[in-house]
Amino acid sequence: MIVMDQIAAMQALMRQYRREGKTIGFVPTMGYLHEGHTSLIDRARAENDIVVLSVFVNPLQFGPNEDFARYPRDFERDRRIAEQHGVDVLFHPEADEMYPEPLTVRAIVQARADVLCGRSRPGHFDGVATVLMKLFNIVMPDRAYFGMKDAQQVAVVDGLIRDLNFPIELVPVPTVREADGLAKSSRNVYLSPQERSEAPALYAALQAAASAVERGERSAAAIRRMVREHIEAHTHAEIDYVEVCSYPDLTPLETLAGTVLIAVAVRFASARLIDNIMIELPKTGEQGDGKGEQACFARS
């Protein structure tokens, strides 16, 4: 495995791979790798000649009162995990390599960024889009891999790739969960034992909502109320949002139809957790297949 920390050298290596006709799969991360990240790496390994992993805690996507300074970091551990999973190139730049001076140009995400997490984290997705534009230009991948735990980020990246004509295939990968249903996250290390015992209630609430949809519930208000009541009954967390929206455009829904995202975010004392579930339903006005409107769960 090659470890790189300089942009110019990284670009030269990527050009060499391209001259050799090799396909490049890219997994951008902020490090502190877990099974969610390794599922992305493994998928990239299966589909590409070269797998590139970036580990960079991007300061642009953290707000002034967020956890940039204490975000978990352990590069040697990340290096070992990357090598074990067959990463070819590990790109680990410092902040002053990525941002040597104040930016004169940065991304502003016009759509899909002012709802869900974007409502309480203004500028977050602008920072995500800015660093991804830089990383895409550095790595020049054929495919980029993102986890569906952050479905809003995947939607934003989808728009970024399409609107700016990056010749990159976006590959969404299903959420990886603990045995009790909690979505894998680097921020789970912040949870106290009590909070950790309560956190699986997020996915349980989403599953209960999905079951209600499967039984025929189509009211977004009813689904939101059901999820909120379950979380309030089983945790001490403060609910940031419970939303039901279309995907990938993230338009809030009143009646469930088409591709539906049910998404939640909560705040425990030291950790903000997100989760979601995706449901496929007939679009409004579509004829069924004679078997009724059975929900199809595309991603978990």
From Swiss-Prot:
Chain positions recorded as beta-alanine binding sites: 61
Binding site for ATP: 30-37, 147-150, 176, 184-187
Residue ranges crossing the lipid bilayer per the database entry: none
Catalytic-site annotation from UniProt: 37 (proton donor)
Pfam families: Pantoate_ligase
SUPFAM superfamilies found in the cross-reference section: Nucleotidylyl transferase
Record's keyword annotation contains Cell membrane: no
Catalytic activity, as annotated: (R)-pantoate + beta-alanine + ATP = (R)-pantothenate + AMP + diphosphate + H(+)
Location relative to the cell: Cytoplasm
Binding residues for (R)-pantoate: 61, 153
GO MF terms, alphabetically ordered: ATP binding; pantoate-beta-alanine ligase activity
Metabolic or biological pathway, per its Swiss-Prot or TrEMBL entry: Cofactor biosynthesis; (R)-pantothenate biosynthesis; (R)-pantothenate from (R)-pantoate and beta-alanine: step 1/1
EC number: 6.3.2.1
Annotated family: Belongs to the pantothenate synthetase family.
Note: The reaction proceeds by a bi uni uni bi ping pong mechanism.
Entries under NCBIfam families matching the protein: cyt_tran_rel, panC
Protein name as it appears in the record: Pantothenate synthetase
UniProt source species: Geobacillus kaustophilus (strain HTA426)
